[in-house]
C-alpha cells in the first residue's frame, strides 16, 4: 500500500503543501510550467485576472507562505461563486479542479462562520487572488500524480500569541483556522512558538486533498518503508524546520 504522509509538526501553509507535493510527484517541472502558464495567460487561458503578480519558478509563486490571508479586509475581493467559476474554467486537469474546489469549499465555510456571512455572500481577499487559486489547483495536480492509496497527516502544530493584520493584533490560531478545525478530525497541538504556524489555505489544502489523521499512537515512519521524502519551508520564519512529506510503502 502506498501512503502519502505529511508531518505537520512544524505547521503547514498552502505554499509548503504545494512545494512538498510537487517535489514528491516527480513532475515538478510540468507543475511549475503550468503555474507559470496560468500566471502569464490567466487561469482560464484568457486574460489575466490580475490580483498581484505570480513569480512562478521552483519553490514558491507567493500564494501564501505564512501571510495573514483574509484576516484583514482590504483591496479587491472575490465571491465564492466567482472562485468556483474560475476553478471550473481553468485549464488544469479534472483531478486538480476537484481538489481545488474542495479546498475552497472548506475555506468558504470557515470564512462565512468567522464573518457572519453565508456561502452566497462570503468574499475572499488574499485567498481569492489568482496566486492562491493557482496554488490550490497545482497542489491537486501534484497529488494526483503521486497516485497513493492513502493520504495521512501527523498531529498538526500551530503557534501561540498574536499576529498583526490590517485590523491590529489577532490571536493564534487565527479565526479562520479555528473555524476549519471544527470541520475535521485532525489532532491539533500547540508548539512553543510565538507566531502563526498554520494558515487557512494550508489546513484547507490538507482537508481538500482528503488527508486523514494517523491512528492514535501510530508511527507510520517506523511501520512503513520510506520511498521518497522532502521538506518544504513557508514564507514565515518560525525558527523551526519546514513541512516534511513522505511517500511510504506499507
Question: Where are the regions a protein language model picked out?
Answer:
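N-terminal phosphate-binding or glycine-rich loops at protein starts, especially the Walker A/P-loop
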Residues: 1-40
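Conserved phosphate/anionic-ligand binding catalytic regions in large, soluble enzymes, centered on
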Residues: 6-20, 124-147
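Acidic, glycine-rich active-site loops and adjacent beta-strand->loop/helix elements
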Residues: 9-10, 38-39, 128-130, 155-163, ...
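Mobile "lid/hinge" segments at catalytic clefts and subdomain interfaces of large enzymes
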Residues: 28, 148-250
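Short beta-strand elements
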Residues: 33, 52, 62, 143, ...
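Histidine-centered metal-binding segments
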Residues: 37-82
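Anion-binding (especially nucleotide phosphate/pyrophosphate-binding) glycine-rich loop
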Residues: 78-123
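Flexible, glycine/proline-enriched loop segments at strand-loop-helix junctions
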Residues: 89-98, 123-130, 162-168, 189-197
Amino acid at each position: 500500500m502506498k501512503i502519502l504522509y505529511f508531518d505537520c509538526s512544524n505547521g503547514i501553509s498552502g505554499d509548503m503543501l504545494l512545494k512538498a507535493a510537487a517535489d514528491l510527484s516527480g513532475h515538478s517541472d510540468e507543475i511549475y510550467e503550468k503555474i507559470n502558464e496560468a500566471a502569464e495567460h490567466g487561469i482560464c487561458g484568457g486574460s489575466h485576472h490580475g490580483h498581484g503578480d505570480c513569480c512562478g519558478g521552483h519553490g514558491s509563486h507567493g500564494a501564501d507562505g505564512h501571510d495573514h490571508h483574509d484576516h484583514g479586509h482590504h483591496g479587491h475581493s472575490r465571491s465564492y461563486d466567482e472562485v468556483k467559476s474560475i476553478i471550473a474554467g481553468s485549464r488544469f486537469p479534472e483531478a486538480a479542479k476537484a481538489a481545488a474546489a474542495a479546498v475552497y469549499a472548506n475555506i468558504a465555510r470557515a470564512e462565512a462562520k468567522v464573518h457572519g456571512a453565508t456561502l452566497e455572500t462570503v468574499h475572499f481577499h488574499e485567498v481569492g487572488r489568482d496566486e492562491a487559486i493557482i496554488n490550490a489547483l497545482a497542489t491537486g495536480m501534484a497529488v494526483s500524480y503521486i497516485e497513493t492509496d492513502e493520504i495521512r497527516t501527523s498531529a498538526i502544530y500551530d503557534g501561540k500569541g498574536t499576529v498583526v493584520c490590517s485590523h491590529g493584533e489577532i490571536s493564534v490560531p487565527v479565526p479562520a483556522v479555528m473555524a476549519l478545525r471544527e470541520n475535521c478530525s485532525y489532532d491539533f497541538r500547540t508548539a512553543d512558538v510565538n507566531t502563526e504556524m498554520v494558515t487557512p489555505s494550508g489546513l484547507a489544502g490538507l482537508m481538500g486533498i482528503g488527508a486523514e489523521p494517523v491512528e492514535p499512537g501510530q508511527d507510520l515512519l517506523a511501520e512503513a518503508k520510506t520511498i521518497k521524502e522532502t521538506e518544504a519551508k513557508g514564507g514565515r520564519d518560525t525558527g523551526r524546520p519546514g513541512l516534511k512529506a513522505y511517500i511510504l510503502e506499507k
